[in-house]
């Protein structure tokens, strides 16, 4: 799939993170996917749904369980939501954006009520500490960050899955090679 490799071989993943020269990362889907879906007769709206399933919405606006409304109810203001959203674009998981470095230590202590000790703990999970369950975090994560696979994508016919097989399993839920 595609020519992003050094020879004729399966690509290693459908969705990749490209490191930017100025810092940060950019999430990109294999550019052959939309072309292949078009060639197989999928409508543009279906293709967009499949791509969004793979790479995510890259926002928590409209996400299930963890979204701007629920975060406002936990103490987030517009400035904090803006800082959070700017980090979600390159996030592999939403939990990586919920930290004192993104939100600001003062905000985390004064607005959210966390202690210095909590924020200093390397394994501190801010989303769990805010009261979200693992299932809620997973659902919001899939919405925002995507699945990184076409397996289970809306509209995609099972007989078309082999077209998108890679050298590795793709994403957390991928089973195919």
Residue positions per predicted region:
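Long, C-terminal-biased catalytic regions of enzyme "large/alpha" subunits
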Residues: 1-177
